[in-house]
Amino acid sequence: DFIQCFLKIEGYTTKAAWALTDALHLEAIRLIAKHLRGAVENTKEGREGMALGQYVAGMGFSNVGLGIVHSMAHPLSAYYDTPHGIANAVLLPYVMEFNAPETGEKFREIARAMGVKGVDDMSQDEYRKAAINAVRQLSKDVGIPEKLHSIGVQEKDLVSLSQDALKDVCTGGNPRNCTAEDILEIYRLAFK
């Protein structure tokens, strides 16, 4: 289930994250980045690696909560019956871009856990982009659409979606404070 990829990244960057949950989330990121493609191809190793990655991710995020990837995905499922994992997968790279200024060194560790080489030699901007690009590539490799319009989201609903997302329980855990206008802009970027 691709959603676990997002639970671990969101949990790792949430305001409530701490040393133990960071370790759990980084291990889950590593496992899922390594095994997701194989799981989609239905290999035994891929399925087993994903099962372990999902379990480890659950131990992490259940202790710290989530952020606006989930806040924004919940209304998509309510309005359009979009599968929750797909909604999260489409939104994650856009939310990562928004949250990057409030994540310190965490994107370096995300990039490293996802197998990006040379992160120690990268500037902050470079490793943040590398982490986001690694997520985008993994999504592409397993057939996740890049844009919201590809999953049936209608532009006329973006304002209402933004207002609903802002009220979601997960919003408070996001590492970067946001407004309905911020969320609307993220939806617009993900829509086009």
Q: Where in this protein do the model-derived segments appear?
A:
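Glycine-rich phosphate/pyrophosphate-binding beta-alpha loops
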Residues: 55-88, 168-173
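Short, amphipathic C-terminal "tail helix"
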Residues: 154-192
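Catalytic cores of large soluble enzymes that bind and process phosphate-bearing ligands
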Residues: 13, 17-24, 42, 64, ...
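Charged catalytic carboxylate motif
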Residues: 31, 49, 130, 134, ...
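Short alpha-helical scaffolding segments that buttress acidic/His motifs in well-ordered protein cores
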Residues: 3, 28, 50-58, 72, ...
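Carboxylate- and glycine-rich phosphate/diphosphate-binding segment that chelates Mg2+/Mn2+
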Residues: 1-64
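Gly/Pro-rich interdomain helix-loop hinge
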Residues: 79-157
